[in-house]
Amino acid sequence: MKNLTDSFVFLGHWPSAGSFGFNTDILATNLINLSVVLGVLIFFGKGVLSDLLDNRKQRILSTIRNSEELCGGAVEQLEKARARLRKVEREAEEFRVNGYSEIEQEKMNLINAAYQNLEQLENYKNETIHFEQQRAINQVQQRVFQQALQGALGTLNNCLNGELHLRTIGANIGILGAMKEITD
């Protein structure tokens, strides 16, 4: 009876007829079936697997090449950018130096022009002062001369009588006659 019940228990574990299933119990499977399945998998799977690996390898190599090309392009662009930066820095330094020297030159030109203007103004001032002094001196001399002349005329008119007047005229005529003889 025990055998009979064991038979029924095993029937419950077996797959039904016409269906396909895997027996995961290694000890219960047939080694020949396993070797056949593994052989078929290796034979057919090897090509598929090698194709998959080759494709993956090609994609990886292509990605590496693209990355290297991009890296090379980036390095080239970086070098160009550095060269442009150095050029711009040199130009900026030249502009800065030239700008400072031009500013200094312009500053010196303005200072020199200011000194020249000051010298001209000083000369004009001195000339104006000298001119005004000469004019003042001339005015004073004219006034002194006029006053002296008026004083002399007043004195002469007071002191001069007819006889003295005739003697003065005679003396002057004598001087003029002597001068005429010398010039002839």
From Swiss-Prot:
<keyword id="KW-0066">ATP synthesis</keyword>
<dbReference type="InterPro" id="IPR002146">
    <property type="entry name" value="ATP_synth_b/b'su_bac/chlpt"/>
</dbReference>
<dbReference type="GO" id="GO:0009535">
    <property type="term" value="C:chloroplast thylakoid membrane"/>
</dbReference>
<dbReference type="GO" id="GO:0046933">
    <property type="term" value="F:proton-transporting ATP synthase activity, rotational mechanism"/>
</dbReference>
<keyword id="KW-0150">Chloroplast</keyword>
<keyword id="KW-0138">CF(0)</keyword>
<comment type="subunit">
    <text>F-type ATPases have 2 components, F(1) - the catalytic core - and F(0) - the membrane proton channel. F(1) has five subunits: alpha(3), beta(3), gamma(1), delta(1), epsilon(1). F(0) has four main subunits: a(1), b(1), b'(1) and c(10-14). The alpha and beta chains form an alternating ring which encloses part of the gamma chain. F(1) is attached to F(0) by a central stalk formed by the gamma and epsilon chains, while a peripheral stalk is formed by the delta, b and b' chains.</text>
</comment>
<keyword id="KW-0813">Transport</keyword>
<keyword id="KW-0375">Hydrogen ion transport</keyword>
<keyword id="KW-0934">Plastid</keyword>
<feature type="transmembrane region" description="Helical">
    <location>
        <begin position="27"/>
        <end position="49"/>
    </location>
</feature>
<comment type="function">
    <text>Component of the F(0) channel, it forms part of the peripheral stalk, linking F(1) to F(0).</text>
</comment>
<keyword id="KW-0793">Thylakoid</keyword>
<keyword id="KW-0812">Transmembrane</keyword>
<comment type="function">
    <text>F(1)F(0) ATP synthase produces ATP from ADP in the presence of a proton or sodium gradient. F-type ATPases consist of two structural domains, F(1) containing the extramembraneous catalytic core and F(0) containing the membrane proton channel, linked together by a central stalk and a peripheral stalk. During catalysis, ATP synthesis in the catalytic domain of F(1) is coupled via a rotary mechanism of the central stalk subunits to proton translocation.</text>
</comment>
<dbReference type="GO" id="GO:0045259">
    <property type="term" value="C:proton-transporting ATP synthase complex"/>
</dbReference>
<dbReference type="Pfam" id="PF00430">
    <property type="entry name" value="ATP-synt_B"/>
</dbReference>
<keyword id="KW-0472">Membrane</keyword>
<protein>
    <recommendedName>
        <fullName>ATP synthase subunit b, chloroplastic</fullName>
    </recommendedName>
</protein>
<keyword id="KW-0406">Ion transport</keyword>
<keyword id="KW-1133">Transmembrane helix</keyword>
<comment type="similarity">
    <text>Belongs to the ATPase B chain family.</text>
</comment>
